[in-house]
Swiss-Prot record:
Transmembrane segments: none annotated. The gene is PYK. PROSITE patterns: PYRUVATE_KINASE. GO terms for molecular function: ATP binding; kinase activity; magnesium ion binding; potassium ion binding; pyruvate kinase activity. This is Pyruvate kinase.
């Protein structure tokens, strides 16, 4: 019987059906005290880690250098390709210092925020410093100011000179250097702070694979981050505020990918609106084939407990169904008690969710939204995915030196692994965030020149057999250039596995 709708497809699901054998979604893990050792990193990689994230809001350069060295050592010992991401601190707004340490702000009491630097280290419950000089120009009377991840809600009642008089809406204890969010405010902070610039230079020196750029508000800021890095780099723009949402189309166009950073975003906009923002942003990224990451509190309870809540399982599954290419873990793997178990659960949830997806409908939806005519390379790649359904093929083999063809194939959401043979190690690591890909390094010194197409196809087939992706008698689809064309995929063919 022909399936006519997603609803029809859903009615045919069965709980006892096995999960997907190969996980399409990539897993990003934040590395911290719980996960920095080589042995734990190897366990994380075996469990499903694809990208190691360093949070530059914390830690010294010595600490991050150790993380980079350990990740590369662990990946090398396992013979796999793992990406490394530098997550910038970004242009944050923070309070000053409080000599008394913890200070209680009581509900319904008046508190003054000031940009007067004489209060920089003299904060009290009645008046404390804020390090954003233009705050008096961008917040209106009646507007909200959130302190400490939204745990303290202040309403502005009066603005005078450098002072903003507010009334606390709840009681909360704050301390030194707490973050401040200004919902709906047109904040004009630069994309790259002095600290960010030094951090990016450190990243360039160590040849990190990705920069996760915090608090991106417009496309120009994406370019600022790229220029500050000083070399070729994949920039993932983190959407964390209203301005980022309002400018999302231009940001998607400028960036190499998008992260829906639900932590700060859920403070800047109402939490229930994050559901809409997530679905909208992911759909826009899917339409144009840009990588999209879902982050924050995905399996947060596993920071302290061995199993996720049912709500967290549903959240991860919903993110996959919404179109996330990658799902990200933060404190769960950085400081949690169960980092490896968390990745195991994350991988299992993704594999179970994959079998609920009607892949043909996803392919047709994306293809129908494209502007025709397509460029030849994309037409070849989309046709390769279409042939998967017609041939019941078990995999797509892509020969790529830049990752471009692999990414185009991934855009059309094939339900099978994409085995990508490349002579460039950098490309193998870049593919660590591309949905469905299995990067394979073609070592020209051992295997001969990269233009020997059949050797490269043979390598991809050997890897697929070893991994159990396909077996003798199965069909696979290959995408590559002809013998005389380099850097341009212009051929597809069906191959019977012998």
């Amino acid at each position: 019987m022909m399936r006519k709708s997603q609803l029809q497809f859903n009615t045919e699901l069965r709980v006892h059906h096995p999960p997907a054998l190969f996980r399409s979604n990539k897993i990003i893990c934040t590395i911290g005290p719980s996960s920095q050792s080589v042995e734990v990193l190897k366990d994380l990689m075996k469990a499903g880690l694809n990208v190691a994230r360093m949070n530059f809001s914390h830690g010294t350069y010595e600490y991050h250098q150790k993380t980079i060295d350990n990740v590369r050592k662990a990946a090398s010992e396992l013979g796999i390709h793992v990406g490394i991401a530098l997550d910038t601190k970004g242009p944050e707004i923070r309070t000053g210092l409080f000599p008394a340490g913890d200070v209680v702000i009581e509900a319904h009491k008046t508190v003054i925020l000031t940009t007067d630097e004489t209060f920089k280290e003299k904060g009290t419950a009645e008046k404390f410093y804020v390090d954003y000089m233009n705050i008096t120009k961008v917040v209106p009377v009646g507007g909200h100011i959130f302190v400490d991840d939204g745990l303290l809600d202040l309403i502005v009642v009066k603005i005078s000179g450098k002072d903003i008089e507010c009334v606390a809406q709840n009681t909360h204890t704050i301390s030194n250097r707490k973050g401040i969010n200004l919902p709906n405010a047109d904040v004009d902070l630069p994309a790259v702070s002095e600290k960010d610039l030094m951090d990016l230079q450190f990243g360039a020196k160590n040849r990190v694979d990705f920069v996760f750029a915090s608090f991106i508000r417009n496309a120009d800021q994406v370019n600022e981050v790229r220029q500050a890095f000083g070399g070729k780099i994949a920039v993932i723009a983190k959407i964390e505020n209203y301005q980022g949402i309002d400018n999302i189309d231009a940001i998607i166009d400028a960036a190499d990918g998008i992260m829906v950073a639900r932590g700060d975003l859920g403070v800047e906009i109402p939490a229930e609106k994050v559901v809409i923002a997530q679905k909208m942003i992911m759909s826009k990224c899917n339409k144009v084939g840009k990588t999209v990451i879902c982050a924050t509190q995905m399996l947060d309870s596993m920071t302290h407990g061995p199993r996720p809540t049912r709500a967290e399982v549903s959240d991860v599954a919903k993110s996959v169904l919404d179109g996330a290419d990658c799902v990200m873990l933060s404190g769960e793997t950085a400081k949690g008690k169960y980092p490896v178990e968390t990745v195991v659960y994350m991988s299992r949830i993704c594999c179970e969710t994959q079998v609920t997806m009607w892949n043909m409908a996803a392919f047709e939806a994306i293809k129908n939204l494209q502007s025709f005519p397509l460029i030849p390379e994309e037409a070849i790649c989309s046709s390769a995915v279409n042939s998967i359904f017609e041939l019941h093929a078990k995999a797509i083999l892509v020969l790529t030196n830049t990752g471009r063809s692999a990414h185009m194939v991934s855009k059309y959401r094939p339900p099978v692994p994409i085995i990508c043979a490349s002579q460039e190690l950098d490309v193998c690591r870049l593919l660590s965030i591309t949905r469905g890909t299995i990067p394979v390094y073609y070592d020209t010194e051992k295997l001969g020149p990269d233009y020997d197409r059949e050797k490269r196809v043979g390598l991809a087939i050997d890897v697929g057999k070893q991994m159990g992706v396909f077996k003798e008698g199965d069909v696979v689809v290959a995408v590559h250039a002809d013998h005389h064309t380099k850097g341009f995929a212009n051929q597809i063919r069906a191959i019977y596995i012998k």
